[in-house]
């Protein structure tokens, strides 16, 4: 029995180490190569293979600065200054969730969201959060802030099977992400908390309020050069 338990533990530890190696090697490759698929994209495709994933990569300099400012105003205003984790944001989210008695705020940074999108899944669990933390730690030490934001903008979800700002700009406005206006950029950034719902409810009050807040603060956010 004891030998069996030891064997199971060794298999478990080996599996964990293999996952870390997979994440590490993926991050090494993606430092210099386009990210053409993520775990979120795969999950969407597996749920309905008849529906194609809409995704087009765009280099950092070819994405409107309006969108870079908008996405950070909406998701992670301290992106330039932290090392993957915004402890003030996490504390604020915990306080709000305690007040409301349910999860109404997440506190995740752009780096944490990207780690989840690339390697994990959306269901909340301590195991997922722990792996997200490890992947975020690795990413922040292997990639520049510019690269993290570039991959995030090209990987984040904007609707059903719709990934990346270029695909979103073409879908919602029929134009490239390079020429997004402030209003358009703020709208796309405002979609992110619940993109599949807002895709069909574009006049939702919460969405419009979030867009106004992003417009108010987007010029004060600092973006990577």
UniProtKB/Swiss-Prot annotation:
Its EC number is 2.4.99.28. Disulfide bonds: none annotated. GO terms for cellular component: peptidoglycan-based cell wall; plasma membrane. Pfam families: Transgly (PF00912). The chain crosses the membrane at residues 8-28. It comes from the Bacteria. Keywords: Cell inner membrane, Cell membrane, Cell shape, Cell wall biogenesis/degradation, Glycosyltransferase, Membrane, Peptidoglycan synthesis, Transferase, Transmembrane, Transmembrane helix. It is a single-pass membrane protein. It is found in: Cell inner membrane. It catalyses: [GlcNAc-(1->4)-Mur2Ac(oyl-L-Ala-gamma-D-Glu-L-Lys-D-Ala-D-Ala)](n)-di-trans,octa-cis-undecaprenyl diphosphate + beta-D-GlcNAc-(1->4)-Mur2Ac(oyl-L-Ala-gamma-D-Glu-L-Lys-D-Ala-D-Ala)-di-trans,octa-cis-undecaprenyl diphosphate = [GlcNAc-(1->4)-Mur2Ac(oyl-L-Ala-gamma-D-Glu-L-Lys-D-Ala-D-Ala)](n+1)-di-trans,octa-cis-undecaprenyl diphosphate + di-trans,octa-cis-undecaprenyl diphosphate + H(+). It is an enzyme of class 2 (transferase). One of its GO terms (biological process) is peptidoglycan biosynthetic process. Pathway: Cell wall biogenesis; peptidoglycan biosynthesis. Belongs to the glycosyltransferase 51 family. Peptidoglycan polymerase that catalyzes glycan chain elongation from lipid-linked precursors. HAMAP family: PGT_MtgA (MF_00766). This is Biosynthetic peptidoglycan transglycosylase.
